[in-house]
Amino acid sequence: MKNISTLYIMKRLLVSIAIVFISILTVAGQNHSFSLSGKWNFRIDREDTGVKEQWFKKSLDNSINLPGSMPEKLKGDEVTVRTQWTGSLYDSSYYFNPYMEKYRIEGQVKLPFFLTPDKHYVGVAWYQKKVTIPADWKGERITLFLERPHIETTVWVNQQELGMQNSLCVPHVYDLTAATTPGKTYLITIRIDNRIKEINVGPDSHSITDQTQGNWNGIVGRIELQATPKIHLEDIQVYPDLSNQKALVRMNIQSASSTKGEITLSAESFNTDIQHKVAPVHQSFNIRPGDNPVEMELPMGKEFLTWDEFSPALYKLTAKLTNGKQTDTQQVQFGMRDFKIEGKWFYVNGRKTMLRGTVENCDFPLTGYAPMDVASWERVFRICRNYGLNHMRFHSFCPPEAAFIAADLVGFYLQPEGPSWPNHGPKLGNGQPIDKYLMDETIALTKEYGNYASYCMLACGNEPSGRWVAWVSKFVDYWKATDPRRVYTGASVGNSWQWQPHNEYHVKAGARGLSWAGAQPESESDYRARIDTVKQPYVSHETGQWCVFPNFNEIRKYTGVNKAKNFEIFRDILNDNHMGSQSHDFMMASGKLQALCYKHEIEKTLRTPDYAGFQLLALNDYSGQGTALVGVLDVFFEEKGYINAEQFRRFCSPTVPLARIPKFVYANNETFHADIEVSHFGAAPLKSAKTVYTIKDKFGKVYAHGTVGTHHIPIGNLYSLGSVDMTLEAIDTPQKLNLEVRIEGSDAVNDWDFWVYPSQVELVQGTVYTTDTLDAKALAVLQDGGNVLITAAGKIQYGKEVKQYFTPVFWNTSWFKMRPPHTTGIFLNEYHPLFREFPTEYHSNLQWWELLNKAQVMQFTDFPATFQPTVQSIDTWFISRKIGMLFEAKVLNGKLMMTSMDITSQPEKRIVARQMHKAILDYMNSDAFRPAEKIAPELIQALFTKVAGDVKSYTKDSPDELKPKIN
C-alpha cells in the first residue's frame, strides 16, 4: 500500500479530467446518448388542468431553453406581498411596518428576510419536445435521463404515460424502450410540479426552501436520451478492503433473456503522479431473465494507492460484460479509502482524523440551484481547503454528482443528508409519507453516489420533530448493516433535541459557543464537561453563527436569478439614519470581531480532549432566514476584506499551535503565562519539531523570544509543548503585545494579543466636573464654559432596549425575534487623541470586554444628522439605530463628554475601565479636547428620560431554539 501526493501542476487539466469523468461515470457503458438540451415547448398550468385536458396530446404554445429553471428563464409570476413562500417567517413586521410600505409596492417589491427572485412560481408546468429515436438504436434499452428536475416529474411519450418520480437527490430516469421504436419521431412531454403535497420534506429544507436556493420548477444538469444493451450492467458498487488489499465489486446484470456472459474487471489510477494499474480479473456467468446479482473480488496488489485529504488518489474501475456479439462497458470512480470509528475518533485509513467542516446550505444566488458542473464545486472545495477545512455537511439536501466528483479530486470528507428538515409542519416517525420518502431517498443517493471516496458520512436530515428518535434509530441500524463504506448518524440536531442512542457519531449543538457573556475572555477552558459522557465521536452542530454587518458593495454581484434587495433595504435604513457613509467601516469593524470569535471558538474546540470535529455555520454567508451574515466569506465564497485564508489557517488547519492563557488583560506588576499545546492532525507525526515563540508590540519591538521545546509530535490534540512566561514590569505605558508561537520547518503558526496596563494609575480630575446625570451644577459649569464628564452607566433610558454583549449578533435578530445581543461590535477612530493612553484598533478587541459586555448604549436618533459618537456601537442592520457608549459635544458654552460605560466601579480590579477613565480625564484636561458638534442640553437630558419602545415582530410563532425543550 502506498500513500502518495496528488499532482496538482495544472489545475485546468485536472478540472478537464474531472469534467470528462462526470460523463464517464454516468454515461459510459451506453452505446449511445444524445443531449436534449435546447429549445422545448412550454406552458404554465396554474390551475392544474393539464392532465384532465390531455396537454400531452397538444403542442404547447410557449417555449423555454433547457436545462434551466423557470426563474432562470424569467418564467413565472412577479413577486408581490401576496407571494406564498416556501419557508418559515418569524418576523412579519415587513407586512405591517409603515417604513416598509415603499418596499411592498407592486412592481417594486423588495424582501428583507431573504433574496428577492426576479420571478417566482409554485405549481405545475409542462415541457415538451419532439425527438427522433436514432435508427441504429434498434435492440437497445432506451431511457430518458433527467439529472436534476425539481420536484415531481411525470412523463408521456406521445399519449402513453410512463410514470411519476419525485426524488430531490438523484436523476429521474424513465425507460422508453417499450414506448418507442428506433427511427421514429415521438412527442416527449414532461409535467413538473414543485408544490409541497403529500410528501412534505419541510418548508425550510434546503432542498426546496426559498430561504436559500428557492423552490423552483425546471430541469437542470444533463437532459439526455441514452441507449444501452438490453443485457447490461447496473448498480456497480465498489467496497474497498484495505487490510486485504482488494476491492469487493457488487453489481447487477439486467437481462431480458437467458444467456451466458463474462465480466472483466480492471482498474487504474488517473489523478496521481505515480500511476498504478491493477491486473484484470475475469468471471463467467449464467444469466437469467431479470436481475442477476454478481459479486467479484478485484485484488489491488501491495502497491495500491490510498485516498484521503492529503493524498486523494483515485481509480477508474472498468467493468466489461461480454455476451456473444454484445459488449457493455461501464466505468466508475472509486478510492481505496477506509473511514471508521474507534472510540471517540474518526480514523481515515487508520489515521486519527479531526473534522474541520462547514455547512453548505444550497445557497447559490446566481442560478438559484446547486452547481451541476465539477469546476464550480472544485472551486468551492479548494477555497474551503485554503481556509483549513477538510469536511462539508450538506444541510438537508444532497448535492449533485458533480460535487462528489470534485470532492474526490480535492480530498474532502462529505456528509450529504436526506433532503429534509422534517419540522415546521411535517413530523418524522409519526407515520407520515416523509418516513418512507426519506428512507427511499437515502437508499437512492447511496446507490447513485456510493462509490465516491468523499462520501464518508450520512444523516437523514436536520432537526426533526415528531416521534423521530425511534425512526432514526432504525435508520442508523439499517445503514450500519447495509453499507460499511461510511459512518452514520440519525439527524444533525441542536442542543434541545434528544440524544440518538443508536448513532455511530453525533452531530449536536451544546458543546459550542463562547462564555464571554458571563466571564472574561480566556483560552484555558474547553468543552470537555459537555462531551465527557458521550461514548461516540462528537461533532459540533452549526458552530459559530457570529454575524457581521452587510457589505453593500456586494450588491452588484447579484446578477442572476436572486437579487440582494434585502441589502438594498438595509442600506436605505442606514442612509435614513444618517450613517450611510459608515457602511464599509461597520462591515470591517464587525468583521474583525466576528473573526476573533471564530478564532476563539475553533481553538476552544481544538483544545478539547476527544472532540472529533466541528461544522461551522458557516464559512460563507447564508442568504435567508432573515439574512444571516455569518460567514467570513460572502455567499459567493469570496473574501470581504477583514480576514484572509492565511490568517484563518493560523487557528484552523491540520496543525495548530494553541495557548492556554488565563486572561488577556494584565497589570505590569503581574507575569504573563501561557501553556503551549498543539493540535496536530496532519499526514504524519512531526519528528524533532522545534517550537519557538516571540512577544512583541505593534511596532515589531521584541520583548521576549525563545524556544518552547523540541518534541516528537504525534497525531492528536492536547499534546503539551511547554510554556511561556514573561514578567511585565518593563511595560510602563499601556501596551498591546502579541505572543506568536511557531513550529519551525512547518506552516504551523498562531498568535494571541494581550494587553498590559500600569498597576498604579493617578486619576487627575483637573478642571473636569464629573457627575452621573445632567444636574443643575453640570448645566452651570457648561454655561460658564467649563468641562463636564457624565458617567451614566445604568442610568440610560433612550437606548435601553438595545442589548449589547461583547460578542456580536447570533444568526440574526429577525429570525430569533430580537433575542440579545443586538449589536455587532464597535467602531471608532483609533487615531482620536483620547486613545493615546488607551491602545485600541478601530474595532472591538478583547481588552474592550470589560467595558462593552452588557453595557448600556445611548441612542442618538434625535441628534444632528452629522453627529458621530466617539465609541459607536454597531446596531443590528434591520434597524441601524445610531447608538454609542462615548461621545463629546459642545453644550451651551462648555464642553461635555458622556459615557454609558462603567468606568468608575472597582478600579482596583477593573484596570481597563480605570485606564479608560484616566484617558478620558487626561484628554478632557488637554488642549486636544475640542468637540466639533454642538448639542442642545435637551437632547442630553432626553437620554435619561426618553423611551424608544421594543421592536415588534408581529409573528407569534418562533424558531425551535426559542421554544420549550420538546424535541
Q: Which stretches of residues belong to each language-model region?
A:
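Accessory carbohydrate-binding/adhesion or oligomerization-edge regions at the termini
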Residues: 29-108, 187, 191, 195-197, ...
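Accessory beta-strand-rich segments of carbohydrate-active enzymes
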Residues: 43-47, 76, 87, 92-107, ...
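Beta-strand-rich binding/interaction modules
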Residues: 155-157, 246-285, 294, 671-710, ...
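Extended acidic/polar, glycine-enriched regions
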Residues: 181-184, 252-340, 730-762
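N-terminal carbohydrate-binding accessory modules
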Residues: 318-384
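Substrate-binding/catalytic cleft of secreted carbohydrate-active enzymes
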Residues: 381-384, 391-633
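Short alpha-beta junction capping motif
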Residues: 766-812, 890-893, 920
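Catalytic beta-strand/loop cores that center a nucleophilic Ser/Cys/Thr
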Residues: 794-798, 814-911, 929-967
